[in-house]
């Protein structure tokens, strides 16, 4: 399903649970429109939105279908985060970037959460970890062993320090996959087959 559409449906049938995307491929969308959609969603759910974003890239055909050069995806996500935050927080807002430019525009309604909803960065690559440290309010990990998890947190800390940011209030989350089978090996084979197909990677031992 399209994640933000699904979260809008959940907003109407829940009252307390936080609603988040894990993760939204921001490079495939126009960030000014995304700012409006997510601001509306945060209003509908009463300030419960967590906006999880990522680069993706496992399936280049997604980018081809959207007319987005695959090699630009990281740069588009980094800039898109700044675009979304600018429109969430400023009225009027102006932005001059590589992919997006506007002068004296605004969106309404603004998000309920102030100064803006949290943005969590998903990914395992060094580029994703650096982005989380520079721009994120949190990090979403997935399919990572404890040693690599600890190393990743240190990379995030160093990136934040280089950007002159503190990590007070920074949140770490983990995307967990659960597979049920008659025994461990059966469940594991099903998990590896499903995840390898979904992410176009080999998740085998």
Walk through the language-model features, giving the residues of each.
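Active-site-adjacent structural elements that line small-molecule/cofactor binding pockets in enzymes
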Residues: 1-205
């Amino acid at each position: 399903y399209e994640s933000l559409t699904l979260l809008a449906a959940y907003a109407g049938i829940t009252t307390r649970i936080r609603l988040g995307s894990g993760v939204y491929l921001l490079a495939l969308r126009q960030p000014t429109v995304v700012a409006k959609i997510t601001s509306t969603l945060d209003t509908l759910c009463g300030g419960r939105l967590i906006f999880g974003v990522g680069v993706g890239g496992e399936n280049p055909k997604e980018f081809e279908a959207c007319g987005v050069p695959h090699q630009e995806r990281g740069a588009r996500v980094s800039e898109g985060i700044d675009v979304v935050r600018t429109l969430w927080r400023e009225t009027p807002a102006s932005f001059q970037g590589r992919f997006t430019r506007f002068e004296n525009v605004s969106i309404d309604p603004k998000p309920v959460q102030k100064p803006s909803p949290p943005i969590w960065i998903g990914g395992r690559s060094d580029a994703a970890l650096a982005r989380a440290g520079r721009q994120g309010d949190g990090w979403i990990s997935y399919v990572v062993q404890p040693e690599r998890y600890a190393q990743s947190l240190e990379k995030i800390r160093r990136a934040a320090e280089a950007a002159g940011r503190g990590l007070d209030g920074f949140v770490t989350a983990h995307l967990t996959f659960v597979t049920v089978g008659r025994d461990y090996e059966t469940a594991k084979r099903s998990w590896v087959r499903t995840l390898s197909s979904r992410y176009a990677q080999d998740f085998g031992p």
